[in-house]
Amino acid sequence: MRSHYCGALNRSHIGQQVILSGWVHKRRDLGGLIFIDMRDREGIVQVCFDPKYQEALTEASALRNEFCIKIEGEVIARPDNQINKNMATGEVEVVAKALSVYNVSDVLPLDFNQNNTEEQRLKYRYLDLRRPEMAQHLKTRAKITAFVRRYMDENGFLDIETPMLTKATPEGARDYLVPSRVHKGKFYALPQSPQLFKQLLMMSGFDRYYQIVKCFRDEDLRADRQPEFTQIDVETSFMTAPEVREIMEKMVHGLWLNTIGVDLGKFPTMTWQEAMERFGSDKPDLRNPLEIVDVADIVKDIDFNVFSDPANSSNGRVAVIRVPNGINITRKQIDEYTQFVGIYGAKGLAWVKINDINAGLEGVQSPIAKFLTTEKIKAIFDRTSAQSGDILFFGADKWQTATDAMGALRLKLGRDLGLTHLDEWKPLWVIDFPMFERDEEGNLAAMHHPFTSPKDFTPEQLEANPTSAVANAYDMVINGYEVGGGSVRIFDPKMQQTVFHILGIDEDQQREKFGFLLDALKFGTPPHAGLAFGLDRLTMLLTGTDNIRDVIAFPKTTAAACLMTDAPSLANEKALEELAIKTIM
């Protein structure tokens, strides 16, 4: 039914007889001639019907867009004045000798020549995927997974499947629950990750494991999140954190080179503390040259409580972003930026425009100038490397609030002012995260997950001072996206019980939820570490789209619904009865 793909034809095929199968992309009737653009998954080629093959020409008059057809014909060179440099096949065309119509098409509910709403695209996803750009996204995804499998196989990793129906464990998000018909009143959980199973595989002696695996999280969705997503999941025994990072960095380096021909170079490493202080984010976008600078020590004794109060607080921060040549930012824009940081809890946004850096206070324009002395403003200029023509934005609040607000402002300024180098790739590793953080109720929670090992802490030291512990964890960040994260795991049962205890999981709950893990840790568990990459997010970056749904064949909406199949749907009453479940709505 096919000898070649449409999009694969080129000058080397001139003179060859070919059989093509695909769809009518466009049709043009020029009187005595009919041209169509014929499309398959590999691309588009122009097909010409001319009077030499009258039967095919007559049949072609009935063709319409999206008819599914077969063409038999000869590849010829296009005349020089008809070469289309915008098409991969633009130097050739196919003269059709025979035409078969596999199937006709109704008028499409989507218009491929216009921008359709995302709702329309998701409802008719099978048609949306016919678009060349969508087909290219899925081909890139397949290329990525093929490369990953090759790399992992070459480096001695075993592809081992782990269960989909498993036990609910606290991993930071709600589980999708599956009721058991056999064990009435009991539920399986769909895995948020294969975390515990891959650790158990290390205990079983499979020292290099990987899996490209579906995971599930019932959480509030964002543009780059889905309720079901795919991980490249990795675990190793007898490897240190730097060794794990090295082998995974080589994989990602090769992936970029193989997929888009980009050399990412050596990945720099930065601590979580440095990333937060300099960039206001634990996944900094290093394409943006703006940085956050602390000035609390300079302003702690000025007569301006907005600055001096957080500057003198152990939990406060006063920070500055210098925008080079930002003096022309208008008051209206400043007001908009003030509203913007308010989204992150900031109470305001102070600013200083520098007209003449050599004139001290006389050379600045600012509503806070009256609270500053010549010495203070000079110290701030020196700290921020300010120049005439710059503007300084100040954030002052609790440390986390000021950091989050200034980090978000940094990104917005970079986008708005064209400072972020969108044509660059800036990868890095972020390491040494806090072991614990406070949740909304003020309780300690694991920043990564409760199986992450602390750095250089005994169980006794961790119990005594948990908030000072640093996790032996690491995230890979590319252009402001966390593409992968992992850690060295706890392999000592006493340390694991200590972490559970700090998290408020008592001994009875430990046995109920994690008894199998605690038992396994007693039998000669090796030191082990791992990492997981988000395949969807990697593909999103490598295809250049900003919407993760563009790289998943059949994604869900932000409301976790499938518009095409109308899932989720009401369950059959008899099925619910067999499961001993009653719905209350």
UniProtKB/Swiss-Prot annotation:
The lineage of its organism: Bacteria, Pseudomonadati, Pseudomonadota, Gammaproteobacteria, Pasteurellales. Belongs to the class-II aminoacyl-tRNA synthetase family. Type 1 subfamily. One of its GO terms (cellular component) is cytoplasm. ATP binds at R217, D218, E219, Q226, E482, G534, L535, D536, R537. Catalyzes the attachment of L-aspartate to tRNA(Asp) in a two-step reaction: L-aspartate is first activated by ATP to form Asp-AMP and then transferred to the acceptor end of tRNA(Asp). This is Aspartate--tRNA ligase. Its EC number is 6.1.1.12. GO terms for molecular function: aspartate-tRNA ligase activity; ATP binding; nucleic acid binding. It catalyses: tRNA(Asp) + L-aspartate + ATP = L-aspartyl-tRNA(Asp) + AMP + diphosphate.
